Amino acid sequence: MFLWLFLILSALISSTNADSDISVEICNVCSCVSVENVLYVNCEKVSVYRPNQLKPPWSNFYHLNFQNNFLNILYPNTFLNFSHAVSLHLGNNKLQNIEGGAFLGLSALKQLHLNNNELKILRADTFLGIENLEYLQADYNLIKYIERGAFNKLHKLKVLILNDNLISFLPDNIFRFASLTHLDIRGNRIQKLPYIGVLEHIGRVVELQLEDNPWNCSCDLLPLKAWLENMPYNIYIGEAICETPSDLYGRLLKETNKQELCPMGTGSDFDVRILPPSQLENGYTTPNGHTTQTSLHRLVTKPPKTTNPSKISGIVAGKALSNRNLSQIVSYQTRVPPLTPCPAPCFCKTHPSDLGLSVNCQEKNIQSMSELIPKPLNAKKLHVNGNSIKDVDVSDFTDFEGLDLLHLGSNQITVIKGDVFHNLTNLRRLYLNGNQIERLYPEIFSGLHNLQYLYLEYNLIKEISAGTFDSMPNLQLLYLNNNLLKSLPVYIFSGAPLARLNLRNNKFMYLPVSGVLDQLQSLTQIDLEGNPWDCTCDLVALKLWVEKLSDGIVVKELKCETPVQFANIELKSLKNEILCPKLLNKPSAPFTSPAPAITFTTPLGPIRSPPGGPVPLSILILSILVVLILTVFVAFCLLVFVLRRNKKPTVKHEGLGNPDCGSMQLQLRKHDHKTNKKDGLSTEAFIPQTIEQMSKSHTCGLKESETGFMFSDPPGQKVVMRNVADKEKDLLHVDTRKRLSTIDELDELFPSRDSNVFIQNFLESKKEYNSIGVSGFEIRYPEKQPDKKSKKSLIGGNHSKIVVEQRKSEYFELKAKLQSSPDYLQVLEEQTALNKI
């Protein structure tokens, strides 16, 4: 087993070392397609984690696509080989860090896509080496901070997309050296945009996206309001909606006045101070060291009451334009928008980028969508908020297939029929806030496959049916705040990749984590404030879930309302044991990993969350291999044990432990012989010494202490079998003067022997015998080898007989031989020879 593990680890190490030196042609790993002499290299989902090991393609210009790979960190010189790349896609890589110099070598790069990653900061050295960059996309990340000078080297940058991040402010002069024409900062946490240091450097912008930020409509927002009012009509600027203070919540910034923004009068008149020469936008240094300016000093001025600043400059009042900026703005202002039909009570304007129509029917006392006559063609945005619309029919949006934004907020809508929006397949933003909707069900949102932003706040929603949001696979923002929700169905968010969720000011006493909150895998912001949280055991799971989230995801802290002793206390300040005393009786599991398993209690019982994610495939394969090897090893050991245990002699002999006797089978057979009855062989001679030989030859290797044993006879008689060695010792002590006699020897050994004892072939008695009978019992040895010599029978007795039986075919012949009278001298010689042995 250990050998297998060693071999596997060695193979992995060797393969790793080999990979570090291998350089592969990129078109052998990725797909390369040439379109109009431009090569497109697609390395999506090919498990690339070291692009510097790939050889660049043989092409003057090419586009690189490294989406959906394992590029968690970009190290210096990662793309050093790709000097002719004009675009680079790095989206969906879970990219967390970009080290300085990672893009060195990409001198020809024009477009960089970093969307859908986990970046938290853009450093000053992040974009070194890509000074020719014109397009930068970094949306749907976790960016909180942008360091000063992050874009200082990007003099040609025109498009910057930073929407749906966690940016709360923009540093001073962040866009000073860029040439931005498109800026998207939607879906962040920006509350204000100062003119000095930010807005003054984006005078050439033609599109600015400001939506979905918590704008603080106070005195700090006066510079932005003044700047927006002075922008020309053909420049698209997204709506900035006030979130604070509460009396201006939901109001458009452009609809507010200075008195509402700044009631105390402080800063009500927006002034632009004179900037020092170092901060002048267009200037250069002469050889004498003096600064020459191509634009006038910014004077501290106040726009006159009778003059419309927008007619003068196109930029905020007090800022004189350079010739370049002025010519650009004039070209936009002199462009005549196309003539398109516009509904009578509404105001329409054309979007400069795609010539789409923006229809503004806000607060026109419209009671039905059928009043919009004539219906606008090619409408991209439709604002009908602030009216008295009560019902919405299926036919109301039949001619609005190209809508990108639909605003139905602040009406009196109570019920929305099914399939109302089924033909709005291009809709990305839907506002239904400020109505009287009580229930949501799946049929309402059928057809909204591209919807990204859904606003349902300030309604009377009490119930949301299961699967309501499943038809919106691109939904990223959902506002359900200020409703009457008490619970959410299980898996309500499983079909929507929500990044921002607002559940503030509802009736939630607790929210289940399992099946509801744990489905929010792409969450970047959640607001749970203002709910009557019941700080008991049911809320422990929510508390643990909130604590695991990264900093800044939860907008505001959760406060308890019940029980009374915890009222107005922040949930995070209470320990789990205080919320749920039952946890004191349960031993807490030690934390052995950064993401331990968490046990909590819900109304359905204790639930245990999984410890951080799925097991890597390599570890899983290695574990299965180890288990397989251990199983084979254990099975082999069991097999060997069973075979060795079963390897035993086939026959055992009772009382005899020597394996030499393995071929001998003893059979005891009882004989009922009377003492006064003579056997049929009573006339035969008997030599008692053969009993000793038999005892020696059939002890089968017993120990010395076991060589002498007794056979008990039923009447109580005993036959003693002595060892030959003991017999020889006894013979040595016999008096030499004693006459050698067979009869005397027999009398000495068997004092009460029978006279009808005879012997024949004494020397052959050493050979094997068929059977041995002892005192009424018969010991048989089965005949297995036919080639053995004839066996002899030995019988001795006094009240018991020792019988050695032969086969029936030999019995009569042996009996005939034994009936002849024995030669005394022959017997004497054999006895003498035996004693010497």
From Swiss-Prot:
Can you tell me where the transmembrane regions are? 619-639
> What would be one Gene Ontology cellular-component term for the protein?
plasma membrane
Q: Name one GO biological process term.
A: positive regulation of synapse assembly
Instruction: State the organism named in the record.
Output: Homo sapiens
| LRR repeat spans | 60-81, 84-105, 108-129, 132-153, 156-177, 179-200, 378-399, 402-423, 426-447, 450-471, 474-495, 497-518
Q: Tell me which residues are glycosylated.
A: N81, N325
Name of protein: SLIT and NTRK-like protein 4
Topology Cytoplasmic: residue spans? 640-837
- Tissue/organ expression: Expressed in the cerebral cortex of the brain and at higher levels in some astrocytic brain tumors such as astrocytomas, glioblastomas and primitive neuroectodermal tumors.
Q: Which InterPro entries match?
A: Cys-rich_flank_reg_C, Leu-rich_rpt, Leu-rich_rpt_typical-subtyp, LRR_dom_sf
PROSITE patterns with a match to the protein in the record: LRR (PS51450)
Presence of the UniProt keyword Transferase in the record: no
Membrane topology classification: Single-pass type I membrane protein
